[in-house]
Amino acid sequence: MTTVIWDFGGVLLRWDPAALIARTLPHRITDELGPQHWKEQFFLSYRGEWGEYDRGVMTEAEMVPLIAKRTGLQVREVQAVVDAVPAELQPIEQSVALVRALRDRGHRLHYLSNMPAPLADRIEREQPFLQLFESGVFSSRVKISKPAPAIFTLAEQAFGCDPATTLFIDDHPENIEAALAHGWQARLFTGADAIAAELRQL
Protein backbone atom coordinates (compact mmCIF):
# COMPACT_ATOMS: atom_id res chain seq x y z
CA MET A 1 0.00 0.00 0.00
CA THR A 2 1.31 3.42 -0.96
CA THR A 3 0.82 6.64 0.98
CA VAL A 4 0.03 9.45 -1.46
CA ILE A 5 0.52 13.02 -0.26
CA TRP A 6 -1.10 15.75 -2.33
CA ASP A 7 -0.50 19.45 -2.75
CA PHE A 8 -3.64 21.58 -3.10
CA GLY A 9 -3.16 24.78 -5.12
CA GLY A 10 -2.62 23.98 -8.80
CA VAL A 11 -3.13 20.26 -8.17
CA LEU A 12 -6.49 19.66 -6.47
CA LEU A 13 -7.63 23.28 -6.45
CA ARG A 14 -7.50 25.60 -9.45
CA TRP A 15 -4.72 28.16 -9.05
CA ASP A 16 -3.81 30.44 -11.94
CA PRO A 17 -2.60 33.67 -10.31
CA ALA A 18 -1.82 35.43 -13.59
CA ALA A 19 -5.38 34.90 -14.81
CA LEU A 20 -6.72 35.89 -11.39
CA ILE A 21 -4.91 39.23 -11.51
CA ALA A 22 -5.98 39.82 -15.12
CA ARG A 23 -9.63 39.30 -14.15
CA THR A 24 -9.40 41.39 -11.00
CA LEU A 25 -7.24 44.27 -12.27
CA PRO A 26 -7.91 44.40 -16.04
CA HIS A 27 -7.01 48.09 -16.15
CA ARG A 28 -3.45 47.19 -15.12
CA ILE A 29 -2.89 44.81 -18.03
CA THR A 30 -0.98 46.36 -20.94
CA ASP A 31 1.24 45.04 -23.71
CA GLU A 32 4.27 45.94 -21.63
CA LEU A 33 2.93 44.88 -18.23
CA GLY A 34 0.91 41.74 -18.80
CA PRO A 35 -0.59 39.21 -16.36
CA GLN A 36 2.69 37.34 -15.95
CA HIS A 37 4.49 40.54 -14.94
CA TRP A 38 1.91 41.33 -12.28
CA LYS A 39 1.86 37.74 -11.03
CA GLU A 40 5.63 37.88 -10.51
CA GLN A 41 5.49 41.31 -8.89
CA PHE A 42 2.58 40.46 -6.63
CA PHE A 43 3.60 36.99 -5.41
CA LEU A 44 7.42 37.08 -5.83
CA SER A 45 7.38 33.30 -6.39
CA TYR A 46 5.90 33.03 -2.87
CA ARG A 47 9.15 34.20 -1.33
CA GLY A 48 7.99 37.68 -0.36
CA GLU A 49 5.05 38.88 1.68
CA TRP A 50 2.73 36.19 0.33
CA GLY A 51 5.25 33.58 1.38
CA GLU A 52 5.13 34.95 4.92
CA TYR A 53 1.33 34.89 4.74
CA ASP A 54 1.51 31.25 3.60
CA ARG A 55 3.78 30.49 6.55
CA GLY A 56 1.39 32.03 9.03
CA VAL A 57 3.83 34.67 10.26
CA MET A 58 2.17 37.65 8.54
CA THR A 59 -1.50 38.59 8.62
CA GLU A 60 -3.53 39.75 5.65
CA ALA A 61 -3.81 43.21 7.22
CA GLU A 62 -0.02 43.40 7.47
CA MET A 63 0.61 41.99 4.02
CA VAL A 64 -1.71 44.11 1.87
CA PRO A 65 -0.08 47.55 2.42
CA LEU A 66 3.40 46.06 2.03
CA ILE A 67 2.55 44.58 -1.37
CA ALA A 68 0.94 47.88 -2.39
CA LYS A 69 4.02 49.88 -1.39
CA ARG A 70 6.41 47.53 -3.17
CA THR A 71 4.44 47.12 -6.42
CA GLY A 72 2.91 50.57 -6.80
CA LEU A 73 -0.59 49.12 -6.76
CA GLN A 74 -3.25 50.84 -4.69
CA VAL A 75 -4.10 49.20 -1.37
CA ARG A 76 -7.64 48.64 -2.63
CA GLU A 77 -6.27 46.88 -5.72
CA VAL A 78 -4.14 44.53 -3.65
CA GLN A 79 -7.10 43.86 -1.38
CA ALA A 80 -9.27 43.10 -4.40
CA VAL A 81 -6.81 40.43 -5.54
CA VAL A 82 -6.66 38.90 -2.06
CA ASP A 83 -10.46 38.92 -1.85
CA ALA A 84 -10.70 37.14 -5.22
CA VAL A 85 -8.48 34.21 -4.19
CA PRO A 86 -11.16 32.04 -2.51
CA ALA A 87 -13.27 31.99 -5.67
CA GLU A 88 -10.20 30.94 -7.67
CA LEU A 89 -9.48 27.97 -5.41
CA GLN A 90 -12.15 25.66 -6.77
CA PRO A 91 -11.79 21.87 -7.06
CA ILE A 92 -10.23 20.40 -10.18
CA GLU A 93 -12.72 17.59 -10.64
CA GLN A 94 -10.39 15.30 -12.61
CA SER A 95 -7.82 15.51 -9.83
CA VAL A 96 -10.37 14.91 -7.10
CA ALA A 97 -11.55 11.84 -9.01
CA LEU A 98 -7.99 10.48 -8.90
CA VAL A 99 -7.88 10.98 -5.13
CA ARG A 100 -11.21 9.19 -4.76
CA ALA A 101 -10.02 6.27 -6.90
CA LEU A 102 -6.89 5.89 -4.77
CA ARG A 103 -8.96 5.98 -1.59
CA ASP A 104 -11.29 3.31 -2.98
CA ARG A 105 -8.26 1.10 -3.68
CA GLY A 106 -7.12 1.35 -0.08
CA HIS A 107 -4.22 3.77 -0.31
CA ARG A 108 -3.49 6.14 2.55
CA LEU A 109 -4.08 9.77 1.58
CA HIS A 110 -2.78 12.97 3.17
CA TYR A 111 -2.19 16.55 2.02
CA LEU A 112 0.72 18.95 2.43
CA SER A 113 -0.16 22.46 1.33
CA ASN A 114 1.31 25.94 1.57
CA MET A 115 -1.82 27.83 2.51
CA PRO A 116 -2.56 31.00 4.53
CA ALA A 117 -4.66 30.40 7.63
CA PRO A 118 -7.85 32.16 6.43
CA LEU A 119 -7.84 30.13 3.21
CA ALA A 120 -7.04 26.89 5.04
CA ASP A 121 -9.99 27.51 7.37
CA ARG A 122 -12.27 28.20 4.43
CA ILE A 123 -11.17 25.10 2.52
CA GLU A 124 -11.87 22.95 5.58
CA ARG A 125 -15.36 24.45 5.88
CA GLU A 126 -16.33 24.39 2.22
CA GLN A 127 -14.58 21.54 0.39
CA PRO A 128 -16.19 18.10 0.86
CA PHE A 129 -13.27 16.34 -0.84
CA LEU A 130 -11.20 16.83 2.34
CA GLN A 131 -13.14 13.86 3.73
CA LEU A 132 -11.13 11.66 1.35
CA PHE A 133 -7.95 12.34 3.37
CA GLU A 134 -6.84 10.84 6.66
CA SER A 135 -5.13 14.08 7.63
CA GLY A 136 -3.04 16.92 6.32
CA VAL A 137 -0.67 19.76 7.08
CA PHE A 138 -1.19 23.41 6.16
CA SER A 139 1.95 25.56 6.26
CA SER A 140 0.27 28.35 8.21
CA ARG A 141 -0.63 25.97 11.04
CA VAL A 142 2.95 24.80 11.58
CA LYS A 143 4.79 28.02 10.63
CA ILE A 144 6.90 26.16 8.04
CA SER A 145 6.36 26.08 4.30
CA LYS A 146 7.58 23.96 1.42
CA PRO A 147 10.30 23.50 0.28
CA ALA A 148 11.88 23.78 3.76
CA PRO A 149 13.16 20.31 4.77
CA ALA A 150 11.57 20.66 8.22
CA ILE A 151 8.03 20.50 6.85
CA PHE A 152 8.72 17.14 5.20
CA THR A 153 10.09 15.78 8.48
CA LEU A 154 7.06 17.11 10.33
CA ALA A 155 4.63 15.66 7.77
CA GLU A 156 6.33 12.27 7.83
CA GLN A 157 6.01 12.13 11.60
CA ALA A 158 2.42 13.39 11.59
CA PHE A 159 1.30 10.95 8.90
CA GLY A 160 3.32 7.99 10.16
CA CYS A 161 4.44 7.20 6.63
CA ASP A 162 7.39 5.19 5.34
CA PRO A 163 9.45 7.24 2.85
CA ALA A 164 10.01 4.14 0.71
CA THR A 165 6.27 3.79 0.09
CA THR A 166 5.35 7.48 0.05
CA LEU A 167 4.50 9.36 -3.15
CA PHE A 168 4.28 13.16 -3.10
CA ILE A 169 2.48 15.09 -5.86
CA ASP A 170 3.09 18.83 -6.27
CA ASP A 171 3.17 21.36 -9.12
CA HIS A 172 6.36 23.20 -8.07
CA PRO A 173 9.71 21.68 -9.10
CA GLU A 174 11.50 22.98 -6.00
CA ASN A 175 9.02 21.15 -3.76
CA ILE A 176 9.50 17.95 -5.74
CA GLU A 177 13.27 18.28 -5.37
CA ALA A 178 12.91 18.79 -1.61
CA ALA A 179 10.69 15.72 -1.26
CA LEU A 180 13.13 13.59 -3.24
CA ALA A 181 15.99 14.83 -1.06
CA HIS A 182 13.97 13.74 1.96
CA GLY A 183 13.73 10.22 0.57
CA TRP A 184 10.16 10.30 -0.70
CA GLN A 185 9.08 9.36 -4.17
CA ALA A 186 7.73 12.46 -5.89
CA ARG A 187 6.10 13.43 -9.17
CA LEU A 188 5.64 16.87 -10.71
CA PHE A 189 1.97 17.52 -11.42
CA THR A 190 1.38 18.95 -14.89
CA GLY A 191 -2.24 17.86 -15.24
CA ALA A 192 -4.62 15.13 -14.14
CA ASP A 193 -4.38 13.22 -17.42
CA ALA A 194 -0.59 13.13 -17.29
CA ILE A 195 -0.42 11.57 -13.85
CA ALA A 196 -3.49 9.32 -14.03
CA ALA A 197 -1.76 6.43 -15.79
CA GLU A 198 1.06 6.41 -13.26
CA LEU A 199 -1.35 6.41 -10.33
CA ARG A 200 -3.28 3.49 -11.79
CA GLN A 201 -0.12 1.40 -11.44
CA LEU A 202 0.10 1.88 -7.66
What is the meaning of each model-derived region?
Residues 1-97, 104, 116:
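N-terminal helical cap/lid subdomain that shapes the substrate entry/recognition surface
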Residues 2, 6, 116-202:
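Asp-based, Mg2+/Mn2+-dependent phosphohydrolase catalytic module
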Residues 24, 102, 199-202:
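Alpha-helix C-terminal capping segments
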Residues 97-100, 104, 157, 177:
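Surface-exposed alpha-helical segments enriched in charged/polar residues
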Residues 104-106, 183:
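Glycine-centered short loops/turns at secondary-structure junctions
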Residues 113:
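Conserved phosphate-coupling serine/threonine residues in phosphotransfer and NTP-handling enzymes
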